[in-house]
Amino acid sequence: MKFPIKTIRRGGQITAFPKNSLEVSKLVKFSNKYKFHILPIGGETNRVDGTKPQFEKTILIDFKKMNRIEEVDTDNFIITAQSGTLLKTIQKAANNKKLLFPVNIAPSDKCTIGGNISTNVGGLQTLRYGNIEDHINGLEVVLSDGTILNFLNKLKKDNFGPKLWKLFCGSELSLIHI
C-alpha cells in the first residue's frame, strides 16, 4: 500500500503531515479506500484524549505543517491562513499591518486557527467582538469523501444566499477538515 504523502507509522496508526488541502484530500480518499479512521490534530490544546486513537487502523492528520499565512490583504482587512497556523502568528501578522484580529485565548502560542474554527472559540473579548465565526469571511474545506470546497471570499459585504461555510464553524471537525 503506497501512501500519498510523508508519514510516520506506529503499528496500525499512521501520522501524516499534509502541507496543503490537496494532500488532505488525498489522505481522506486513501483512508476511505483502505478503511482507516481519521483523527485530525491541531495544537492539541483541548486535550481530553481527543488525540488518542481509539481504533487500530487510524490516520492521525497533523496540521502543523499547514502553518502558512498566504496573504494579508489590508485593503479588504482579510488574512488568508492555513489551518495549522498558530493564533499568535495570525495576531502578529494583523498587528504588523496595523490591523486587529480580536480573538484572544490563553494558549495563543499553541492553538491553531483550524482548531479555533472547529470549536468556534470565543475568548477573552467575546462579548465585545463575538466568536471566531464572526471574523471569518470564508473557508476552504475538505469533505469526508475528499472533495475540496472553496468558500474563500474577499467581499466584505456579500448578500449572496446563506453562508454554507458557517455550518463548519463549531462542528468540531465532524463534517470536514478545515
Locate the predicted segments by residue.
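Charged, low-complexity, helix-prone segments enriched in Lys/Glu/Asp/Gln
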Residues: 1-3, 141
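Ser/Thr-glycine-rich phosphate-binding loops at phosphate-binding pockets of nucleotides
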Residues: 42-46, 86, 177-178
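FAD-binding subdomain of flavoenzyme oxidoreductases
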Residues: 68-72, 78-176
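Glycine-rich N-terminal segment of FAD-binding domains in flavoprotein oxidoreductases
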Residues: 3-66, 81, 101-103
